[in-house]
Amino acid sequence: MIVIADDITGAAEIAGIAFSEGHQVSLVCGSSACCDIVAAQTTVIATDTRSMTEAEAIAESHRIASHLSPLTTYLFKKTDSALRGHVVAELTALMEATGYQRAVYLPANPSKGRIIKNGRYYINNVPIHETDFSFDPEFPAKTSVLRERFPDAEAKGIIMPDAESEENIRRLIAEYNDGKTLFAGAADLFSALLNVNHGDAYHGDRPSDSSLRLANHGVSPHDTLILCGSTQSKSLDLGIPIAPMPREIYDGNDDLSLWDTSEYAKIHSLILTMPFTHRTGKKAAVHLRSMMAQKTKELITQHQPSHLIIEGGATAWATLQTLGWTQFKIVAQIAPGVVQMSATIACHTSTCGSKKRVIVTLKPGSYPWGDLFSSSADT
C-alpha cells in the first residue's frame, strides 16, 4: 500500500499505525518523496500540500503520482480529520493521474469522537465550526456541512458518506472496495483498510502494547526542545521553561531577537509557544511557522537536544525542512498520532561530536499526548 499524506504529522500517524500492526513501513518526505520508493508493505509519502496554494498542491499531487510504480496495487490519500486542506483539488489530481474512477472521502474518526452525521461533521457532539478549528489560520472551519465546505466534490466524483462508528467505516469499505475507488480520509479509515487489504500479509509477531510503551523515549527536563506550533496547543506543565512568541513577532515582525529564549542556554531545555490566535490567512500562517522554525534552528545551533518534540503538522514540516532533517526511522507509537522517529544527523555544535542521534516526536495539534509526559516514561 502507498499512502500520500498532506502533512508530515498525518504521515507519521499513518506510519505509526502500520508500525504498531507489525507491518514493514517506510516513511519518506521532502525531496526524497519521488526518489526510489522502498518496497515495503506500507510506504508513506509525507508532503506539505496542505500548506501550499491550491495550484501548487495540484502540481505536487501530479508530480508524486507520476513517480508511483505501475505495480502499485493500492493507494490511500491521508487527509486531515478536521476538513482542512485542498481536499477536492488534490483528490481530483490523483484520480486524473492514476485512473481511479471515483473517490470516497471520509475524514471521520469515530474512535476520537469525530463523526459525520446527516452530512455534518461533529467533534464530541459539537459542530466543527463551533470548535477551536474556527481559528485555524489557513482553513478556518466556517461550516460543519460537508457539501458547503466542499461544494464541487460530488460533481467531481468524490463521495462524502456519513460515518458514526467504526462499523460504519467497515461497511463503507465493503461497499466501495472495488479497485476503481480511491479511498481518502483519516486514521480510522486507514486502519480499517489495512486490516481488509493486508490482514493476512504479515507473518511475524505484532509488537505488544507493553513493548511499544517500553520504546517510549520519555521527556527529560534537561535536554529537550518542545515546539507548540498549533492553534490547538494546550499548556504544558513539565518543569521546563516556557518561551512564548512575543506579540510583536506574532503580528508580523521578523526580528527573532525580540523572542527571549535565554533560558535554553542554562539547562538546554525549552518550550516554545504561540499564545495568540487572532491572525488567520495564508500570509500569517507562513510567517508564524517560519519564525518558529528559524528560532528552533537558532537554538539547535547553540545546543543540539536529544529530544525534539513538535506539535502541529505545518510547524513540523517547516522546522524539519529548515533543519535539513528528512530521513527518519520510526521507533515508537506513544498514542494515536503521537509517533517517535530516530534521526542521526550531523552535529556542528561544541556540545556534541560529528554526529548525534536525535529522537523526534511528532503530534497533530488536536490530538492528546498519550503517556509521553508520564512519570513512567523511560527518561
Range-by-range predicted roles:
Residues 1-2, 20, 24-32, 41, ...:
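Cap/lid and interdomain-hinge subdomains that line or gate substrate/regulatory clefts
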Residues 3-5, 26-28, 75-78, 102-107, ...:
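General beta-strand structural signal in soluble alpha/beta enzymes
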Residues 7-10, 79-88, 110-112, 165-167, ...:
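Gly/Ser/Thr-rich loops at beta-strand to alpha-helix junctions
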Residues 20-42, 255-266, 330-352:
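N-terminal short beta-loop-beta anion/metal-coordinating cradle
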Residues 120-203, 209, 213-214, 219-260:
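Conserved, well-structured core segments that form the ligand-binding/active-site neighborhood
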Residues 228-300:
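A glycine- and small/hydrophobic-rich beta-loop-beta segment
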Residues 299-327:
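Active-site beta-strand/loop microenvironment that shapes enzyme catalytic pockets
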Residues 316-372:
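Conserved, well-ordered active-site substructure
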